[in-house]
Amino acid sequence: MPSMIVVGGQWGDEGKGSIIAYLALHDEPEIIARGGVGTNAGHSVFINGKKYAVRQLPTGFMQRKARLLVGAGVLVDPEVFFHELEHLKDFNVKERVGIDYRCAIIEPKHKELDRSNGYLHGKIGTTGSGCGPANADRVMRKAKQAKDIKELEPYLTDVAAEVNDALDEGALVLVEGTQGFGLSLYYGTYPYVTSKDVTASSVAADVGIGPTRVDEVIVVFKSFPTRVGAGPFPTEMPMEEADRLGLVEYGTVTGRRRRVGWFDFEMARYSARVNGATMLAVTMLDKYDKEAFGVTDYDKLPRKAKEFIEEIEEKVGVPVGLIKTGPELEHIIDRRDTI
């Protein structure tokens, strides 16, 4: 069985959480591991009409048979971690989660610096979660590690060893990235970016998967890309236009209103290339064409929606295998057997 990595192709908030949740339940991976930056990115998923938002734990938590892991490359905020254990207690998360003992720790001083620094919080528009300052301490070899926090001891593990052991045994491993290509420290709209690279290569390294062991890379795009905070947004539409189209969204972590734009095919193609996409996922197709809401059969999509998907495939050069047509888990078209 393969390893599968899911990353964002735009500026985050693409709907990765809903794609990951579907894959977790449908494909039944034995391990779901989180890579990415840390608690500055929130993933949301609707289960039976209830919204669950996580910032630290893997979004595939609802797959009760899976081991849930947080890779060594991820920053851990103990306060957020324990809050989510309680928040998700109905899913038996506490007994299934493991944190790599090498994860760097976000301390209160990091959050305070993130929120009080005029450049980071004012100009760049960071979330104030402390990730940038914590990663800076990590680079300077000053950050604490998970193994230094007594309260985390029951959850410590070697994530890289667990993941590679699972792959050796033929198990399916699902790896979650955070944020999106446009926020990558290396490839994004610098300096309006996050504090590390968030492409598929880095996300694989975060959990200890070498490049030869990556089988599938799914890059997620939203039909109308959004961005929270400052920075270039070439296809941004006026807020009045977003209101008219019913495209009003707020960030999971910050609560700030998201800027909205038109689909950027040029960016999508570049993002897919650098991420090494084997497949694309498109979310919120129902926002592009309201008649697509709830459709689960590709052949039954209205013409406008289907032409949009075909245009993405043609211009990006990668097949679209998963299409979200609404907020609930079952609002999805799975074309993976036909592409």
Swiss-Prot record:
Q: Which reaction does it catalyse?
A: IMP + L-aspartate + GTP = N(6)-(1,2-dicarboxyethyl)-AMP + GDP + phosphate + 2 H(+)
Q: Where does GTP bind?
A: 12-18, 42-44, 258, 284-286, 324-326
Which cofactors does this protein require?
Mg(2+)
The positions annotated for binding substrate are: 252-258
Instruction: Give each disulfide bond as a residue pair.
Output: none
Keyword Metal-binding assigned: yes
- State a single Gene Ontology molecular function: magnesium ion binding
The residues annotated as the active site are 13, 43
Question: Where is Mg(2+) bound in this sequence?
Answer: 13, 42
The record's listing under SUPFAM superfamilies reads: P-loop containing nucleoside triphosphate hydrolases (SSF52540)
Cofactor note (record): Binds 1 Mg(2+) ion per subunit.
Instruction: Give, as in the UniProt entry, the pathway in which the protein acts.
Output: Purine metabolism; AMP biosynthesis via de novo pathway; AMP from IMP: step 1/2
Q: Where in the cell is it found?
A: Cytoplasm
Give the UniProt keywords, A-Z: Cytoplasm, GTP-binding, Ligase, Magnesium, Metal-binding, Nucleotide-binding, Purine biosynthesis
What the protein does?
A: Plays an important role in the de novo pathway of purine nucleotide biosynthesis. Catalyzes the first committed step in the biosynthesis of AMP from IMP.
Q: How does it assemble?
A: Homodimer.
**Which protein are we looking at?**
Adenylosuccinate synthetase
Name the source organism. Answer: Pyrococcus sp. (strain ST700)
Taxonomic lineage from the root:
Archaea, Methanobacteriati, Methanobacteriota, Thermococci, Thermococcales
The gene name reads purA
